[in-house]
Amino acid sequence: MARDKIALIGSGQIGGTLAHLVGLKELGDVVMFDIAEGIPQGKSLDIAQSSPVDGFDAKFTGANSYEAIEGARVVIVTAGVPRKPGMSRDDLLSINLKVMEQVGAGIKKYAPDAFVICITNPLDAMVWALQKASGLPHRKVVGMAGVLDSARFRYFLADEFNVSVEDVTAFVLGGHGDTMVPLVKYSTVAGIPLPDLVKMGWTSQARLDEIVDRTRNGGAEIVNLLKTGSAFYAPAASAIAMAESYLKDKKRVVPVAAYLNGEYGVKDMYVGVPVVIGDKGVERIVEIELAGKDREAFDKSVAAVQGLVEACKKIAPELLGH
């Protein structure tokens, strides 16, 4: 049986980390694509040379032509300019929109059967544009946001309670940005919801609110600390978890930016919601009931994404023709 082929579009920090993780987890052969000559080839060779030490068998190829991604089962897209300090996600819009159009055309031509995971920011708008440009079925194109945001929330909670991260589940909905919605009542430690832990005296509501805020600003906190660049270890690990659920038909329930067509009262937009990922892609959208403040926060988040999508339509009206 031939190994699966995994294509990585963009060979920056996330791209390199993705390639390394694919090797370590033996998920398949890797093609790293980038417009910069030498970078994907150099990183591929470097990672390939670590394989005898770590004991994984995989072929790593660097390429500057989309032809190399032909037949990929999974395509993970990180191409685009990164966010710099002081730059809003929206500033990235027009630059990265053009990149998505080019990437989408490459996927359409060479990997039309792939499961596509977008990581490029501003995430919810970019995954929408990528689906339009590629013409792939909505269930086969998703955005990586919620897994990362939930991981940050889980890490902060585990740290606060001094318990294993494995015993903390957390739920983050909405757009990938300052308006994301970490749902406290659906987040648990060993199955005990956070509001109950407040009653048990494990923490206070005020402290939980601080952790929610820190989660919202998780990406910006790292950007400000690094000064040059943004997070790449946790985003890469998050995308790999999604890819693995697809490749192995694990049917994991994970929050991703998924296409909504009526669910949660949202139409023709990608928004972060819990879904089941199996070998058909997004196999089910989990529609939980939202009320009160949670519903308000979710609607606000959706409105922020809607604003970005409308801006995309103005910048690139040709996407609507796809």
Curated annotation (Swiss-Prot):
GO BP annotation list: lactate metabolic process; tricarboxylic acid cycle
Reactions it catalyzes: (S)-malate + NAD(+) = oxaloacetate + NADH + H(+)
Residues binding NAD(+), per UniProt: 10-15, 34, 96, 119-121
Keyword set includes Glycoprotein: no
Binding site for substrate: 83, 89, 121, 152
Catalytic residues, chain numbering: 176
Entry keyword set: NAD, Oxidoreductase, Tricarboxylic acid cycle
Matching InterPro entries: L-lactate/malate_DH (IPR001557), Lactate/malate_DH_C (IPR022383), Lactate/malate_DH_N (IPR001236), Lactate_DH/Glyco_Ohase_4_C (IPR015955), Malate_DH_type3 (IPR011275), NAD(P)-bd_dom_sf (IPR036291)
EC number assigned by the record: 1.1.1.37
Any one Gene Ontology molecular-function term assigned to this protein's record: L-lactate dehydrogenase activity
Pfam families from the UniProt entry: Ldh_1_C, Ldh_1_N
Record-stated family: Belongs to the LDH/MDH superfamily. MDH type 3 family.
Its job: Catalyzes the reversible oxidation of malate to oxaloacetate.
Protein's recorded name: Malate dehydrogenase 1
Organism: Rhodopseudomonas palustris (strain BisB18)
Designated gene of the protein: mdh1
